[in-house]
Amino acid sequence: MAKQASESNRAFGVHSEVGQLRKVMVCSPGRAHQRLTPSNCDTLLFDDVLWVENAKRDHFDFVQKMRDRGVDVVEMHNLLTETVAIPEGRKWILDNQVVPDQVGLGLVDELRGYLESLTPRDLAETLIGGVSTHDFPDAHGGEMLKLVREAAGMTEYLLPPLPNTLYTRDTTCWIYGGVTLNSLYWPARHEEPILATAIYKFHPDFAGKVNVWWGDPTRDHGLATLEGGDVMPIGKGNVLIGLSERTSRQAISQVAAALFKKKAAERVIVAAMPKLRAAMHLDTVFTFADRDCVLLYPDIVNNIAAFSYRPADNSAGLELRKDEKPFVDVVAEALGLKKLRVVETGGNAYMRERTQWDSGANLVCASPGVVFAYDRNTYTNTLLRKEGIEVITIVGAELGRGRGGGHCMTCPITRDAVDY
């Protein structure tokens, strides 16, 4: 208990990719994943339906293995339950989610009344799991509900399910001493930042203790989209951000300017990547395994062009220059290292592509040289072990069906710096 109290009082902040992981937020599989069907999983950004019971078991195993390594793991359903138990928190979420553009003008009051009647736990489950017209009680619906059911069927959603909350990395990201509240690319994920932001604003563990560098989920950011899988605070004032399928140059420039204005970072290294589903974020092709060791998918990373933002005395507050060195060398130089040890996702071209599809490069560090990785990527895990990395395996058969691994499934809230 004394240790838990000490961890809860520690200042929030993520100061490296490999320092001791102290506190992390996850979101367990649940009702939202039971909504996945062969006809809707593509729209909801999953490649297949999940065996939900097994996904829950495997996620619990991952959480327990992190706790065994001293990590304080907090779960989003639980945090949201405690947040909506606070009247101001519940009101803020419903004010921003139960709106005419989402629900339809004729059902706003009815849906709001139904949600207000739920217990905090049921409301949290519903906000993540969604509300279909089939779920919605006839007593609350009236003629508009009959119209919606007649026109769209019983699987029409008044609030959409959010199965991608499983990948907590993307919705918000902690960069040194503060956090960004991200604007996500695909419509299937647009509601997620509201829930995470409410936790930071109203939950007693976070309220009044969070520095927000950038982002406001209550407004439309247009083309400025940012997802946490592209963001890595690697240390020494440097931040890596992937310019990818889901993170735009508009957002990167705004985040860089905000960080520089608040003296939260000294350099933002932009990794210009191809826009591919199999390489949707930087962390799907490049992650750290130790203070001086990275795992990468060479077919993509060897073709990344690096650009660097630095503070400048101009109207934008920043300047951008192309880095002439290869991307990995740019990262090493930024950390003051002569070079990084590089482990490539291995095998022939077929194995490399399969490993990439199975999130083989998506490691998350518990501490320097200790990583969590999917068990199925046996060849790459063996290469890591030969390099002296301790690989703790987690089962990825179900959890990876949305194309994310351990790095994607964790939102670090507190992580130690590394002495470079």
From Swiss-Prot:
<feature type="active site" description="Amidino-cysteine intermediate">
    <location>
        <position position="408"/>
    </location>
</feature>
<dbReference type="Pfam" id="PF02274">
    <property type="entry name" value="ADI"/>
</dbReference>
<keyword id="KW-0378">Hydrolase</keyword>
<dbReference type="GO" id="GO:0019546">
    <property type="term" value="P:arginine deiminase pathway"/>
</dbReference>
<keyword id="KW-0963">Cytoplasm</keyword>
<protein>
    <recommendedName>
        <fullName>Arginine deiminase</fullName>
        <ecNumber>3.5.3.6</ecNumber>
    </recommendedName>
</protein>
<comment type="pathway">
    <text>Amino-acid degradation; L-arginine degradation via ADI pathway; carbamoyl phosphate from L-arginine: step 1/2.</text>
</comment>
<keyword id="KW-0056">Arginine metabolism</keyword>
<dbReference type="GO" id="GO:0016990">
    <property type="term" value="F:arginine deiminase activity"/>
</dbReference>
<dbReference type="InterPro" id="IPR003876">
    <property type="entry name" value="Arg_deiminase"/>
</dbReference>
<comment type="similarity">
    <text>Belongs to the arginine deiminase family.</text>
</comment>
<dbReference type="GO" id="GO:0019547">
    <property type="term" value="P:arginine catabolic process to ornithine"/>
</dbReference>
<dbReference type="GO" id="GO:0005737">
    <property type="term" value="C:cytoplasm"/>
</dbReference>
